[in-house]
Design a protein with these regions (language model features):
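Bimodal "functional hotspot" detector
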Residues: 3-9, 15, 19-146
Length: 146
């Protein structure tokens, strides 16, 4: 009985710490702050993570259509990172050809430069785009073609 009570108390403590951390992170980002995901420099101190977020303030009006919000985030992502320790997984010159939001899925068609990506490079680029776009409340899936 004591062990079960101790385990329950530890679990409650862990969950409250996680909730506090999430609330603090949400509070730190202002209402126009979004995270754009890029490749991190493998030689930078700390190492370990292949992808890291860069906070970007974008003016996305609450009345904007989801498609316009997706377009704004994609354009910021295609422009590349501001931080020198980050690099874009998306080939230079890649452009957005078309965009459609259907339900909660964003369907993105990128230019031919993106189609040259293969293997892990393609996976990382897809992952950065997906992580960036699924921050929007009306997007929970992303389809990418080139």
């Amino acid at each position: 009985m004591r062990r079960r009570l101790s385990l329950t108390a530890a679990l409650v403590l862990l969950l409250s710490l996680l909730c506090a951390c999430a609330a603090q992170h949400a509070q730190e980002m202002d209402e126009n702050g979004y995270e754009l995901y890029f490749l991190s420099d493998p030689n930078s101190a700390g190492g370990g993570d292949a992808i890291r977020a860069q906070e970007k303030r974008l003016v996305l009006d609450g009345a904007m259509e989801t498609e316009d919000c997706v377009r704004a985030l994609l354009e910021a992502l295609l422009a590349g990172p501001d931080e020198p320790s980050l690099s874009s997984p998306i080939p230079e010159g890649t452009a957005l050809k078309s965009l459609k939001v259907s339900g909660r899925r964003a369907q993105i068609d990128l230019s031919a430069q993106y189609a040259r990506l293969t293997g892990i490079d393609l996976s990382l680029a897809d992952y950065c785009i997906t992580l960036t776009l699924t921050q929007l409340p009306n997007v929970n899936a992303v389809s990418i073609t080139a």
